[in-house]
Swiss-Prot record:
Subunit structure comment from the entry: Homotetramer.
Residues the record lists as binding Mg(2+) 1: E231, E267, D295, D338
Protein EC: 5.3.1.5
Swiss-Prot/TrEMBL cofactor(s): Mg(2+)
NCBIfam families (UniProt xref): PRK05474.1, xylose_isom_A
Localization, UniProt: Cytoplasm
EC top class, as a word: isomerase
GO molecular function annotations of the record: magnesium ion binding; xylose isomerase activity
Main location: cytoplasm
Family note: Belongs to the xylose isomerase family.
Protein name: Xylose isomerase
Free-text comment on the cofactor: Binds 2 magnesium ions per subunit.
Catalytic activity of the protein: alpha-D-xylose = alpha-D-xylulofuranose
Length: 440
């Protein structure tokens, strides 16, 4: 059965085409900085927003009518959903996908049913991957939707909930390994608090760290060579989450000795919820040595919640890709569309329009970022700004050649009187705009 039989495979037709079901800027075979656009972007489609979400919100029921979401045998519906998903991936021509365990398999009424259902669906996903050539970018476990996780999973006051969560992650990590996934993501959606009045912060942080340590141990035990990634988010659904932003996650990992085992999966909308730009979070991840992968989306600047809209800003993404490209690009990570069509976008075509437009935006932004990297005037000016630290005096300070007292004595003896030098922000912004908007 075809779920999108009236929609053709999406092809590159170029910027002059007016076909809404074609790529206008994403030519997967086009080479930029020595790699194809497909190799640079490593695009993935997420299961949850695309095939699981029924179009509901806090004020209304679902608006979508999807064949695989209708009443029926849960496993049969899960197989229908997988068939629809892989037909969609194949028609888009995207190389990767991502999932939560309960996106792809019915949870059942107990752990035994969960593990049996999930095992059957992992077999089926493996068949679909082999038939289509689509690969798994990352898997994860849903430890936030069921009422048992209302007070968290790893940070729950009930150790039985911790044990249930551990069971899900064990099987989700095993499945990711079996399906050839390149990463495993840990998102602590409810690893936080709603009120400090009933929360033991130290205990919950210790529990979270113990859980992560167990995941690390299991990764090595089964021989999974992919990356473990935490996805930072400051709040929502909880008031405050322990993986608030990249810097917070890094500090947590260092505190518990996990900094060499776990990196970050950065979502654009989560960055803005934390009061940061997407650019900031990516640059910070590289500076701290924990960059892993990206969830591509955007929020609405007028709304203070996670709207998960498709990315549409070449300007924002150019700066994000500038950081990624100048640090060598993705290794195991990629650009996963953690984005959903709007609740009123009920046509099957809308799923394609959202992804096609966003993929074109990624391609445009990557090419503009490549212009910045090829003749990296930003880097040259940045190096010039810090050049004195590379001189003998600067190196002596950083290498421990001075104490606080001896440095103060030296400054007094030399009569140090430094003069401020321009930061040239306006010039730098002009360089970025020239790369984005110059006709080429």
């Amino acid at each position: 059965m075809s779920y999108f039989e009236h929609i053709p495979a999406i092809r590159y037709e170029g910027p002059q085409s007016d076909n809404p079901l074609a790529y206008h800027h994403y030519d997967p075979a086009k080479r930029v900085l020595g790699k194809t656009l497909a190799e640079h972007l490593r695009i993935a489609v997420c299961y949850w927003h695309t095939f699981v979400w029924p179009g509901h919100d806090m004020f209304g029921q679902g608006t979508f009518v999807r064949p695989w979401q209708q009443p029926g045998d849960p496993l049969e519906r899960a197989r229908m959903k997988a068939d629809a998903a892989f037909e969609f991936f194949s028609k888009l021509g995207t190389p990767f996908y991502t999932f939560h365990d309960t996106d792809v398999a019915p949870e059942g009424d107990n752990l035994r049913e969960y593990t049996a259902n999930f095992a059957r669906m992992v077999d089926y996903l493996g068949e679909r991957q082999q038939a289509s050539g689509v690969r798994l970018l990352w898997g994860t476990a849903n430890l936030f939707s069921h009422p048992r996780f209302a007070a968290g999973a790893a940070t729950n006051p009930n150790p039985d909930v911790f044990a249930w969560a551990a069971t899900q992650v064990r099987h989700a990590l095993d499945a990711t390994h079996r399906l050839g996934g390149e990463n495993y993501v840990l998102w602590g959606g409810r690893e936080g608090y709603e009120t400090l009045l009933n929360t033991d912060l130290k205990r919950e942080r210790d529990q979270f760290a113990r859980f992560l340590s167990m995941v690390v141990e299991h990764k090595h035990r089964i021989g999974f060579n992919g990356a473990l990634l935490i996805e930072p988010k400051p709040q929502e659904p909880t008031k405050h989450q322990y993986d608030y932003d990249v810097a917070t996650v890094h500090g947590f990992l260092v505190q518990y000795g996990l900094q060499d085992e776990i990196r970050v999966n950065i979502e654009a909308n989560h960055a803005t919820l934390a009061g940061h730009s997407f650019h900031h979070e990516i640059a910070n991840a590289f500076a701290l040595g924990v960059f892993g992968s990206v969830d591509a989306n955007r929020g609405d600047p007028q709304n203070g919640w996670d709207t998960d809209q498709f990315p549409n800003s070449v300007e924002e993404l150019t700066l994000a890709f500038y950081e990624i490209l100048r640090h060598g690009g993705f290794t195991t990570g990629g650009m996963n569309f953690d984005a959903k069509v709007r609740r009123q976008s009920v046509a099957a075509e809308d799923l394609f329009y959202g992804h096609v437009g966003a993929i074109d935006v990624l391609a445009l932004a990557l090419e503009r970022a490549a212009v910045l990297v090829e003749n990296d005037r930003l880097d040259a000016l940045r190096r010039q700004r810090y050049a004195q630290w590379d001189d003998a005096f600067g190196r002596k300070i950083l290498s421990g050649g001075y104490t606080l007292q001896s440095l103060a004595d030296d400054a007094l003896a030399r009569g140090v009187n430094p003069q401020h030098v321009s930061g040239a922000q306006e010039r730098l912004e002009n360089i970025v705009n020239q790369a984005i908007y110059a006709l080429r």
